[in-house]
Swiss-Prot record:
This is Methionyl-tRNA formyltransferase. GO terms for molecular function: methionyl-tRNA formyltransferase activity. Keywords: Protein biosynthesis, Transferase. The lineage of its organism: Bacteria, Pseudomonadati, Pseudomonadota, Alphaproteobacteria, Caulobacterales. It comes from Caulobacter sp. (strain K31). HAMAP family: Formyl_trans (MF_00182). Belongs to the Fmt family. InterPro entries: Fmt, Formyl_trans_C, Formyl_transf_N, Formyl_transf_N_sf, Formyl_transferase-like_C_sf, Met-tRNA-FMT_C, Met-tRNA-FMT_N. CDD domains: FMT_core_Met-tRNA-FMT_N (cd08646), Met_tRNA_FMT_C (cd08704). It is an enzyme of class 2 (transferase). GO terms for cellular component: cytosol. Its EC number is 2.1.2.9. Pfam families: Formyl_trans_C, Formyl_trans_N.
Length: 312
């Protein structure tokens, strides 16, 4: 089929690769405009943009798909279908109705749970046992269209947003060509989403990344894993040169009792919850400002935290 692919982050790259491998004609790839990245904050293309260019595919990076110019350019592609995977923009009706067979979205949750921008992170932070990937026909509402196919994925005890991202990307990239083949032959069954159990995965904001040690150990653990590796849940630790920001990248819940935020041993067991009733979390991986991510043992060699140290 002649299709357009709309995607931006790393999650979308494998999906585009599978569609190319399946022999579809990629008329155009759409992605978000280049953005400041890295320490130098230089403008760099998105992962999808860079990958598409490496394949010699035409790329457009509009600030908005809502302008008359972009709508007309999209129509002029004369598409059979459009595939959207974490593009990052809302598509208006004129865009959705332009392809002959419609626009289809790969979404990283089991809809209607976790509609919206951050389904992977929110599923872990909420303590969900399972999540998944689904292909749906797009409508004007946010992730409200009928579902064509999907697959469940278990969320393991030490799952992070990063590891779950990779699992879901692998499942989704395999699913997309199968879904498009069914759509092309007219054999795709569309199931309306339930009106019950609707939740929204709000975009992760930097302000919510700081760890609140007064929450229970289970909540702190999910917070850490749900925000790992990006943006990274963080706390401040005392040092000879003042407070140092540390990102906690992996943790597990353990028994322990103490004032919230206080180290219970010299191996990163931190008390959680109010009144000593919240348990504790063991930090398994951490990262200081200006340093790379390190396993706890290596981290402590360069930045020891003794029992009784209060973290903020």
């Amino acid at each position: 089929m002649r299709i357009a692919f709309l995607g931006t982050p790393e999650f979308s790259v494998a999906c585009l690769a599978e569609l190319v491998a399946a022999g579809h004609e990629i008329a155009c790839v759409y992605s978000q405009p280049p953005a400041p990245r890295g320490r130098g904050q230089d403008l760099k293309p998105s992962p999808v943009h860079a990958f598409a260019e490496s394949l010699g595919l035409p790329v457009r990076t509009p600030v908005s798909m809502k302008t008359a110019e972009e709508i007309e350019a999209f129509r002029a592609l004369d598409l059979d279908a459009a595939v959207v995977v974490a593009f990052g923009q809302i598509l208006v009706r004129d865009v959705l109705e332009a392809p002959r067979l419609g626009c289809f979205n790969l979404h990283a949750s089991l809809l209607p749970r976790w509609r919206g921008a951050a389904p992977i992170q929110r599923a872990i932070m909420a303590g969900d046992a399972v999540t998944g990937v689904q292909v749906m026909r797009m409508s004007e509402g946010l992730d409200e269209g009928p579902v064509l196919m999907g697959e469940q994925v278990r969320i393991d005890a030490l799952e992070t947003a990063g590891t779950l991202h990779d699992k879901l990307a692998a499942v989704g990239s395999r699913m997309l060509p199968v879904a498009l083949a069914a759509i092309e032959r007219g054999g795709a069954r569309e199931t309306p989403q339930s009106e019950e159990g609707v939740t929204y995965a709000k975009k992760i904001k930097a302000a919510e990344a700081r760890i609140d040690w007064t929450r229970s150990a289970a909540e702190v653990d999910r917070h850490i894993r749900g925000l790992s590796p990006f943006p990274g849940a963080w706390f401040e630790a005392p040092s000879e040169k003042g407070s140092v920001r540390v990102k906690a990248l992996l943790s597990r819940v353990e028994d322990g009792e103490g004032a919230p935020g206080v180290a219970l041993d010299d191996a990163l067991l931190i008390a959680c919850g109010a009144n000593g009733e919240g348990g504790a979390v063991r930090l398994l991986k951490a990262q200081r400002e200006g340093k790379g991510a390190q396993d706890a043992e290596v981290f402590l060699r360069g930045f020891p935290l003794a029992a009784g140290t209060a973290l903020a």
